[in-house]
């Protein structure tokens, strides 16, 4: 009997950014993840919102252990889609979510398993409650108690390598202390030679030592490589704050190249830095990897700095980390801000002097059209005399234009022309052939085509008019007198 499928609803379906990215995918994807020979395009901004490990740009691959189908289900969950899977697929998906830092998917898998089993795995619960114990290989490397006083761990904090001594530290003048100091200086010298190493491996769930994946920048070029180095892993606190074990196949992804990111469609400048996640604090190793690629920006940043930022973000070198400008100290930032503000103030106050180009002045507005003719009744003004006379007929009620086809009368010629179109006729019609013409000049040209012998006696051009005008002669004292003053 087959069990019913399990449905995991995604909490990111209501996020507008995730919805937009899901509709655009695979367009504008700046991340290409290879899993088991299959490539999955994605947006680094969406991945960074759910996991600190996945929020990287470029092309990288996951190690063995995660199947392409499991990773496809994880991506669908991240992009706001509900995932339906069989009960046998729940545990691999939960392990993949735990290894890649997708806490929301891991919790959803826990709830789904709790609904079915009503209790969590006792072995995993015991492992979460008890702190991680060192393996036998690590105890062998520690050696006898006399060797425990030697430097045991080297951790990165804020981009510097600091030696942490176990229990008791030797005196300053002792040979052991001198050797430790010399070794620390050698480590710093090697780090200055662009050997940037950050362990991103994980300890296996069975307590055995896993394989460390190291990030290294080659001095001869910008290409990076992954080196597998066997040996004991660094303490869990230096890389991950959670004590939950992760399988050895959870190899961290690796950034190889950059592509145009999703920030461009949101009109936001690209940000290089640590991917954010609300439940996973930033660690020293991540600070070391990403510290050199943060771009200091201020509200009054100089134009050159913005140009450099845009150039660095828009044209990255394939196979290399995105290079930003050199970091500025607080004093340099303040000096550049003051210099830029002062230059703007100088240009604003002295536009006509040398060194500051004058601002282009807007073209002057055209002068207002004069209206010398005013109505003596309502005071309305007009630019042309015939406009004023036509308006005056509103007060007198005069309609001098009458239609020859019906009793319709109009106040002006344009209104009569519109009325004649309702009869399907033009203002002028030949009495011989019935052809209509839109203007008096065209009617005169049309009548020249007829023989004069065909015209009836006493014919005039006015006989072609389809309207009649009974405008009386204007008195000498016009009610609408021109005015010399303009408003």
Swiss-Prot record:
One of its GO terms (molecular function) is DNA-binding transcription factor activity, RNA polymerase II-specific. One of its GO terms (biological process) is regulation of transcription by RNA polymerase II. SUPFAM superfamilies: beta-beta-alpha zinc fingers, POZ domain. Homodimer (via PTB domain). Interacts with the N-terminal of FANCC. Interacts with ZBTB16. Interacts with GATA3. DNA-binding protein that binds to the to a 5'-TGTACAGTGT-3' core sequence. May function as a transcriptional transactivator and transcriptional repressor. Probably exerts its repressor effect by preventing GATA3 from binding to DNA. May play a role in regulating the differentiation and activation of helper T-cells. The C-terminal zinc finger domain functions as a transcriptional transactivator. This is Zinc finger and BTB domain-containing protein 32. It comes from Pan troglodytes (Chimpanzee).
């Amino acid at each position: 009997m087959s069990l019913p499928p399990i449905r995991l609803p995604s909490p990111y379906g209501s996020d507008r950014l995730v919805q937009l990215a899901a509709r655009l995918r695979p367009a504008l994807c700046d991340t290409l993840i290879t899993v088991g020979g299959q490539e999955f395009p994605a947006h680094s901004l969406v991945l960074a919102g759910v996991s600190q490990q996945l929020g990287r740009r470029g092309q990288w691959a996951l190690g063995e252990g995660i199947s392409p189908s499991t990773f496809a289900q994880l991506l669908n969950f991240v992009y706001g889609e509900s995932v339906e899977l069989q009960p046998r697929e729940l545990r691999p998906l939960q392990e993949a979510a735990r290894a890649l830092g997708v806490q929301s998917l891991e919790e959803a898998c826990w709830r789904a398993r709790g609904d079915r089993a009503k209790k969590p795995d006792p072995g995993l619960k015991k492992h979460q409650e008890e702190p991680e114990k060192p393996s036998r290989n690590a105890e062998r490397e520690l050696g006898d108690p006399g060797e425990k006083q030697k430097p045991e761990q080297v951790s990165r904090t804020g981009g510097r390598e600091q030696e942490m001594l176990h229990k008791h530290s030797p005196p300053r003048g002792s040979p052991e202390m001198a050797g430790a100091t010399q070794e620390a200086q050698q480590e710093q010298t090697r780090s200055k030679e662009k050997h940037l190493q950050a362990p991103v491996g994980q300890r296996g769930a069975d307590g055995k030592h896993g394989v460390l994946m190291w990030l290294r920048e080659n001095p001869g070029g910008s290409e990076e490589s992954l080196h597998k180095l066997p040996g004991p892993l660094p303490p869990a606190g230096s890389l991950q704050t959670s004590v939950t074990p992760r399988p050895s196949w959870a190899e961290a992804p690796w950034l190889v190249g950059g592509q145009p990111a999703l920030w461009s469609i949101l009109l936001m400048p690209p940000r290089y830095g640590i991917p954010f996640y609300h439940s996973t604090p930033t660690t020293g190793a991540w600070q070391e990897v990403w510290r050199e690629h943060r771009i200091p920006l201020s509200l009054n940043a100089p134009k050159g700095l913005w140009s450099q930022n845009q150039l660095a973000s828009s044209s990255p070198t394939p196979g290399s980390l995105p290079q930003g400008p050199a970091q500025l100290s607080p004093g340099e930032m303040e000096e550049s801000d003051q210099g830029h503000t002062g230059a703007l103030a100088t240009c604003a106050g002295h536009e006509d002097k040398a060194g500051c180009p004058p601002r282009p002045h807007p073209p002057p507005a055209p002068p207002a059209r004069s209206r010398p003719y005013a109505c003596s009744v309502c005071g309305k003004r007009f630019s042309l005399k015939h406009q004023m006379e036509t308006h005056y007929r509103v007060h007198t009620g005069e309609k001098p234009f009458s239609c020859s086809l019906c009793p319709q009368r109009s106040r002006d010629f344009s209104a009569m022309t519109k009325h004649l179109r309702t009869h399907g006729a033009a203002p002028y019609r030949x009495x011989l052939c019935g052809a209509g013409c839109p203007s008096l000049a065209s009617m005169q040209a049309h009548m020249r085509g007829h023989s004069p012998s065909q015209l009836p006696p006493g014919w005039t051009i006015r006989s072609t008019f389809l309207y009649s005008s009974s405008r009386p002669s204007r008195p000498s004292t016009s009610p609408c007198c021109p005015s010399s003053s303009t408003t």
